[in-house]
Structure formats: structure tokens, C-alpha cells
């Protein structure tokens, strides 16, 4: 009887609070097995010291569509606690904690606690790795400085390890052989990528030097062609003279190379040519 009276007081308190703020819609509440449920609600308000003085720390909004199946917010009030648990149900997730127990945990349930800040366990974006399909996911491997130093020294000595070396190194570093193998694979991939980047940079510089050398050779070829063709055309008009005897063109600078006139061809009369 006391519990029922307490539930009714809570219900009417919520209604009065909703009517006091006319901007908000009416909030319907009902009692079922000690659980007070908000069927239509937009924002969930954290309540402080609820059992002592019924004071509210913020406001409550109602959804416009009460049959909305995308979001259902349940406020669970334990008997001996002043904190509220928030359960948000979305498609693919269960809306009640009892359904998961009855179905054997076939669907997952997303639970949020408004009384504390989300921790790293609630939303961890770190990478996970699987040894096989049945193994649970585990977080990305975090190495200490000493472990990293020993692994780097081992990698400098040998880029690949046999199973026996993996066992010895894993035992020394307190790791699993599979983790040692994965670390060496990643290290070889990083080393190969670094070497490829260095080779690409070297080839770029070499290509630039060859391009400059090619341009320089082209300029030299053009200069040589200009030097060979230019003076020849100038001297050909100034150093040639006309010989009045043979009417031939001879160079004036070299008289010893004068062309000897060729005698005219002797012609015969028609009678002698017939003989």
C-alpha cells in the first residue's frame, strides 16, 4: 500500500511538472511491478536526491508520436537507490532486460547510465584482432619501451624468425608467438614501404638531373648549328670573284687553286664527220 501510494505521488508530481512548463507535452506514467516507465519521452532528465525532496535537475520532453518504435526510453527506479538507469531500444536491440534472459541472449541490449560519464569500455575505438573465429576480440597490442627496443634489435639481426626463435623471444618478452609473428610482419611491411619511398625519391631526383642535362645538350646543339651555318653564308658572297677570261667563278683568296680553262670542243664540217 505504501509503495502504491508512493508511485501515485511520483506520477502526479510528473504531471504537475509537465503542466507547469506549458511548452512540454503531457507525460503519461504508470506503475508495473515497482518499475515506473515513461512511454513517450524525448529527453531523459537526471534526477538528484529523488527520495528526499522530489527536486528535478532538468526538464522532460515528450515524443510527438507515442507509437514510435525506433526509440523507447525506460526510466527504472530501484527501491533503495536515487539514481536512474536509461535503456534505449533501437531496431536490432532488445527493449527489456527480461527478454534477453528468456531468449538466451539472442539479441544485444544497449544500456546507458546518465549518472556517470561514458568510459572507454562503453565506446572504445581501438583496433581488435582475432586469432580464430571462435576467439573473443581483444585490444590492440601495447608494447613497452623495453619490448619495442628488444624487438627492433631482433629485427635488425634477422628480418624473419623460425618457430623456435619466436618461442624464445615470446617467452623473454612475455608475449605470445603469434604476437611476435604479427609484429615482424608489420615491421617488414613498414621497412619495405620506407625503402620504396626512398627509391622513388631517388628516381625523381635522377629524372630531374637527366632532364636538365637533356635541355643543356639541346641548347649546345642549337648553338653549334648556328655557328656552322652563319659564317659560311657570309663568306660565300664576299670572297668570290669573276674571272674575265673563262667566265668562271673562282675564290680570290686562293689563286693557286684557279680553275684551268678547258679548250673549246673542236667541231668538224659535215663531210669530215661523215667519214
From Swiss-Prot:
GO biological process: response to salt stress
Region annotation Leucine-zipper: where it falls in the sequence: 203-224
GO molecular function: DNA-binding transcription factor activity; DNA-binding transcription factor activity, RNA polymerase II-specific; sequence-specific DNA binding
UniProt-annotated location(s): Nucleus
Cystine pairings recorded for this chain: none
Pfam families xref list: HALZ (PF02183), Homeodomain (PF00046)
GO cellular component, one term: nucleus
Listed SUPFAM superfamilies: Homeodomain-like (SSF46689)
Keywords noted in UniProt: DNA-binding, Homeobox, Nucleus, Transcription, Transcription regulation
Transmembrane parts of this sequence: none
Region Disordered: start-end pairs: 95-143, 252-275
InterPro entries attached to this UniProt entry: HD (IPR001356), HD-ZIP_Homeobox_LZ_Class_II (IPR050762), Homeobox_CS (IPR017970), Homeodomain-like_sf (IPR009057), Leu_zip_homeo (IPR003106)
Segments of the chain annotated as binding DNA: 136-195
Purpose of the protein: Probable transcription factor.
Protein family: Belongs to the HD-ZIP homeobox family. Class II subfamily.
Protein name, as recorded: Homeobox-leucine zipper protein ATHB-17
Species whose genome carries this gene: Arabidopsis thaliana (Mouse-ear cress)
Amino acid at each position: 500500500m505504501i509503495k502504491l501510494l508512493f508511485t501515485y505521488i511520483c506520477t502526479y508530481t510528473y504531471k504537475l511538472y509537465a503542466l507547469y512548463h506549458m511548452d512540454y507535452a503531457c507525460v503519461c506514467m504508470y506503475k508495473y511491478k515497482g518499475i515506473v516507465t515513461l512511454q513517450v519521452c524525448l529527453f531523459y532528465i537526471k534526477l538528484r536526491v529523488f527520495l528526499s525532496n522530489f527536486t528535478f535537475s532538468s526538464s522532460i520532453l515528450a515524443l510527438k508520436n507515442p507509437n514510435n518504435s525506433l526509440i523507447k526510453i525506460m526510466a527504472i527506479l530501484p527501491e533503495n537507490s536515487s539514481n536512474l538507469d536509461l535503456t534505449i531500444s533501437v531496431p536490432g536491440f532488445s527493449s527489456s532486460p527480461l527478454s534477453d534472459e528468456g531468449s538466451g541472449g539472442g539479441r544485444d541490449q544497449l544500456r546507458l547510465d546518465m549518472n556517470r560519464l561514458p568510459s572507454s569500455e562503453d565506446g572504445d575505438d581501438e583496433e581488435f584482432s582475432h586469432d580464430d573465429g571462435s576467439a573473443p576480440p581483444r585490444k590492440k597490442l601495447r608494447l613497452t619501451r623495453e619490448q619495442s627496443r628488444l624487438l627492433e634489435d631482433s629485427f635488425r639481426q634477422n628480418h624473419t624468425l623460425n618457430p623456435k626463435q619466436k618461442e624464445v623471444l615470446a617467452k623473454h618478452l612475455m608475449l605470445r608467438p603469434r604476437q611476435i609473428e604479427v609484429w615482424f610482419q608489420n615491421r617488414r611491411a613498414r621497412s619495405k614501404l620506407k625503402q620504396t619511398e626512398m627509391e622513388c625519391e631517388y628516381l625523381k631526383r635522377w629524372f630531374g638531373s637527366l632532364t636538365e642535362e637533356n635541355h643543356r645538350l639541346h641548347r649546345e646543339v642549337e648553338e653549334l648549328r648556328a655557328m656552322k651555318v652563319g659564317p659560311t653564308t657570309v663568306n660565300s658572297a664576299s670572297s668570290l670573284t669573276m674571272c674575265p677570261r673563262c667566265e668562271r667563278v673562282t675564290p680570290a683568296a686562293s689563286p693557286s687553286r684557279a680553275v684551268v680553262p678547258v679548250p673549246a670542243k673542236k667541231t668538224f664540217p659535215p663531210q669530215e664527220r661523215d667519214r
